[in-house]
A protein has these predicted regions:
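Hydrophobic/aromatic-enriched cytosolic interaction surfaces used to assemble or bind macromolecules
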Residues: 1-357
Length: 357
């Protein structure tokens, strides 16, 4: 396995998003016109405690869920791209002299990494990418260094290999979200150029916040809030098991009181959390406004959630659908794809690594 946060393209592969509650997979291909085609996607639930604190808690349970998702996907492809949570990766931008040879740059990256990584370099994997010329000095380049502890990577790789698949790319979740956002930005005025966009990917227990200015990431943060709170409230209110509550949340069939007493208050809380994230960003950075909000994650499929968030924040809000202008396999239903799309941002961004579109 080449540890490559930044390697551009590889042969086709499946994007695999391992979250705290499920495994999500996306398979894309080249549409022959310089774009992407969605060939398939799948999702399989993870047993409780299979993942803990962003790491693999029970290898066998995670491998089982990966195997199940792969069978549902119905693909022959066994190569996959994985991502680490941003919390497991230390990233830093540094300046270096322009025109350095590859080996000199590698040596300097190691020296830089040594200063800010709190572990021995033997315990970490490091990768770097030259971002371009330094803003104020033509003789320097800006370099992004990413490092993660080997054990964090090895656990995920072992789970995938336990399911009979092969990891060829290791990425970072927020980089994968940014890649998928490049497909979503066409839904915004001027494709998001010269604007500040807040991407909120709402997981089961965490909100992942990524702010892009002029389509470049300027800020990332995690906030403790997620769709799991709605599931727990359904369990508590209607006396259901966790599994029953998850199914009811997605497929319906709950008493009439659900909408007014459970769902609407949850939507208001979610909108308040997004408003908090927005305030935190504008008060702690040089940017004093957000032009657009993009909602991703399972909660973004709740009907009218974009309207509720827009009302609360007074900022134009859309639901992330990275597949909206993609060719879609005939075996997939367009309407279902649109519903499922917001939860597939990371898996889609990872699958994009396999296609030179």
């Amino acid at each position: 396995l080449k540890f490559n946060f930044f390697k551009e393209k590889t042969p086709p592969l499946i994007g695999v998003d391992i979250s705290s509650t499920s495994i999500k997979m996306v398979e894309l291909s080249d549409d022959g016109r310089g774009g992407y085609r969605l060939d398939g996607y799948s999702s399989a639930p993870l047993a409780k405690d299979a993942m803990t604190d962003g790491g693999v808690g029970d290898l066998e349970k995670v491998a089982d869920a990966i195997r199940q998702a792969w069978k549902l996907l119905g693909s022959r492809e066994k190569r996959v791209a994985l991502a680490l949570p941003a919390s497991a990766v230390i990233s830093k931008k540094v300046l270096m002299m322009a025109g350095l040879r590859e080996e000199d740059m590698e040596a300097q990256v190691e020296a830089e990494a040594n200063q800010y990584i709190p572990f021995s370099l033997d315990e970490v994997n490091i990768d770097f990418q030259v971002l371009g010329a330094a803003p104020n000095n033509p003789d320097e380049v800006e370099v992004l260094i990413a490092a993660s502890r080997k054990e964090k990577i090895e656990d995920r790789v072992a789970a995938v290999e336990g399911a009979g698949l092969k990891v060829t790319v290791m990425d970072v979740e927020n980089y994968a979200t940014e890649a998928a956002y490049s497909l979503v930005s066409s839904q915004l005025p001027n494709a998001g150029r010269e604007q500040t966009v807040l991407i909120v990917d709402i997981g089961a227990s965490m909100m992942h916040i990524n702010v892009l200015h002029d389509n470049k990431s300027v800020y990332t943060r995690e906030q403790s809030f997620g769709g799991g709170q709605l599931t727990q409230e359904i369990q508590r209110r209607f006396g259901l098991s966790l599994e029953e509550a998850e199914i009811a949340k997605r497929k319906g069939g709950l008493p009439e009181s659900y909408d007014n007493e459970v769902l609407q208050p949850f939507m208001q809380t979610l909108a308040m959390e997004v408003a908090r994230a927005l305030q935190f960003f504008t008060s702690s950075t040089q940017y004093n406004r957000i032009d657009h909000i993009v909602l991703g994650g399972g909660c973004a499929a709740i009907p009218t959630i974009d309207v509720v968030v827009q009302d609360r924040t007074q900022v134009h809000t859309i639901i992330a659908n990275p597949f909206h202008s993609m060719a879609i396999s005939t075996r997939l239903k367009q309407q279902q794809v649109a519903t499922d799309a917001p939860a597939l941002l990371i898996a889609c961004g990872l699958a994009m690594r396999g296609i030179a579109a």
